[in-house]
């Protein structure tokens, strides 16, 4: 009942997780405005599930602050969910500047626009468990563990967490806008055609009758289904 009639502005709605979230929110009676780049894969869950038919979808770049401002303030959301990101570790080695521009500066621009939105009550900032300084511990990380990251992607997400914390304490608290970060682990589920994902890579190898290549066989990672509450 909480989501019924709520207005949610969702960045990154064309991605794997964003598409599932769009469908779920729409099924709960939420009015969703999506703002994102074109789907990152072909095929994509966004296209196959025809997500654009159940929500208001706008193709745009979070780095374009003017377009983002016009889109968000015209929609007048109650809740902002920020999922747009450059999400790939290996790609971040090839494009570190783009990774920081999207994940750090892009997040700052989203939050800067958000604090101009008079109807906004809450922000959910989606990041990753890779935002922590990796000390190779065998236990899980705690919320107050230090941010860090060895590679450009991971460190960009640590930076994004610091940006969100600064905006919360400097601006959003006094405006009565709540902000929380959600740090996901490895997410699996139907509709994921991205590269460098364990389950899709295994299935692609099976289809081609090729050996399955595990990049980091000694790594221990948390797993969750995309629809897991």
Show the residue positions of the predicted features.
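N-terminal Rossmann-like NAD(P)+-binding domain of SDR-like oxidoreductases, especially those catalyzing
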Residues: 1-184
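Substrate-binding strand-loop-helix patch
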Residues: 57-63, 102, 188-196, 217-228
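Alpha-helical and His/Cys-centered functional microenvironments
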Residues: 86, 228-229
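A conserved pocket-lining segment of Rossmann-fold NAD(P)-dependent short-chain dehydrogenase/reductase
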Residues: 92, 144-146, 174-191, 201-224
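Amphipathic alpha-helical segments in well-structured domains
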Residues: 107, 195-199
């Amino acid at each position: 009942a909480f989501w019924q009639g709520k207005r949610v502005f969702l960045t990154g709605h064309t991605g794997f997780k964003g598409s599932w979230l769009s469908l779920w929110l729409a099924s709960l009676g939420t009015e969703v405005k999506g703002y994102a780049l074109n789907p990152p894969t072909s095929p994509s869950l966004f296209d196959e599930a025809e997500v654009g038919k159940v929500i208001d979808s706008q193709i745009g770049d979070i780095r374009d602050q003017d377009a983002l401002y016009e889109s968000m303030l015209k929609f007048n959301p109650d809740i902002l969910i920020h999922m747009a990101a450059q999400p790939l570790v290996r790609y971040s080695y090839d494009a570190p500047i783009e990774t920081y521009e999207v994940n750090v500066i892009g997040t700052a621009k989203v939050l800067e626009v958000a604090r101009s939105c008079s109807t906004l009550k809450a922000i959910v900032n989606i990041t990753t468990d890779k935002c922590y300084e990796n000390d190779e511990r065998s236990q899980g990380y705690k919320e107050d563990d230090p941010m860090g990251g060895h590679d450009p992607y991971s460190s960009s997400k640590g930076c994004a967490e610091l940006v969100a914390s600064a905006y919360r304490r400097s601006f959003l608290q006094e405006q009565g806008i709540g902000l929380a970060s959600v740090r996901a682990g490895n997410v699996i589920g139907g509709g994921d055609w991205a590269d460098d994902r364990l389950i899709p890579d295994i299935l692609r190898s099976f289809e081609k009758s090729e050996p399955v290549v595990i990049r980091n066989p000694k790594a221990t990672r948390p797993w969750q289904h995309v629809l897991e509450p």
